[in-house]
């Protein structure tokens, strides 16, 4: 298809049309009294949501020009969603309005360079004004208020999120998952940890809408080595495939033949697998892998110092967890094995002794980071309801409220 160049009044008209579509579809969801929107799906029931980002992504005008303009606005919402996790409705409305007003000014004969400079100056003025208004959110009541507003005025959601923040701390790990029960919202505190490493290939993703890897009851293979070839882990891959359970590989790196074979197995459906890099560097990586091994009940962290080889590992020697959640940036392990609590506490006590005996401020800081990850645990918000549509709508609001709360307490 040949490219079409559009300028002048035709372009301005298309911009106005897209802005009006966004105002009608997205603008109505804004604020604590915002309305919900039903999004038609090619299969299954429609999705009911108040999430501006989901609404924006669903807007696909048939006109190619209108679609291109809508995609530009959606990109700004996407960046806002990635960086903050909330505020996408406000971001989209502002972006659409800026584009509309710039189009009007240009049509009236204003110089486009002057318009751009004016927009940038206005942005700085607005940011300065907002920074002067900000204040810290400290109390549990204030946290609940922030979450309640973002959850469309649902006080129960606000109170539960504030409870989670108080339990695991403002830097603690809080996740949201669907419950099989009818109870609208429940909180469960469990062992677990999160580290700053994401999946090594987007092909590992199991939830394409949110670009997540989500595993239930997975096996976990830990190694300090770099995996370049598939041969050393073939026996364990075959055993895991026969078990029907997913596998998470945490290694120094996974690349080349090893990575491509894992991706191929995942795409063919032969094995639910994902791979991430181990957190930390050098000796700190060794220590953090040891922490993960204690938490998950893994008997070995495969390394050059260990007599046992990867080919000889059995399923009983691998780690396990209740759930694994992996984004492009983070890995969250939720729920330790049943008999690991005593071992985790022993590890925590060991780290505390190391902190007291260390003379290096840097080492103390890193030890405290490990202590926080291991002892903080994970708070799980379980969302239930009487129907799938109800659960998904409530889960969207809980996730939005959680993102808003995190942004407020940072």
Swiss-Prot record:
Gene3D superfamilies: GroEL, GroEL-like equatorial domain, TCP-1-like chaperonin intermediate domain. It catalyses: ATP + H2O + a folded polypeptide = ADP + phosphate + an unfolded polypeptide. Keywords: ATP-binding, Chaperone, Cytoplasm, Isomerase, Nucleotide-binding. GO terms for cellular component: cytoplasm. It is an enzyme of class 5 (isomerase). The keyword Isomerase applies. Its EC number is 5.6.1.7. It is found in: Cytoplasm. The keyword Cell membrane does not apply. One of its GO terms (biological process) is protein refolding. Pfam families: Cpn60_TCP1 (PF00118). CDD domains: GroEL. Together with its co-chaperonin GroES, plays an essential role in assisting protein folding. The GroEL-GroES system forms a nano-cage that allows encapsulation of the non-native substrate proteins and provides a physical environment optimized to promote and accelerate protein folding. This is Chaperonin GroEL. It comes from Ehrlichia canis. The lineage of its organism: Bacteria, Pseudomonadati, Pseudomonadota, Alphaproteobacteria, Rickettsiales.
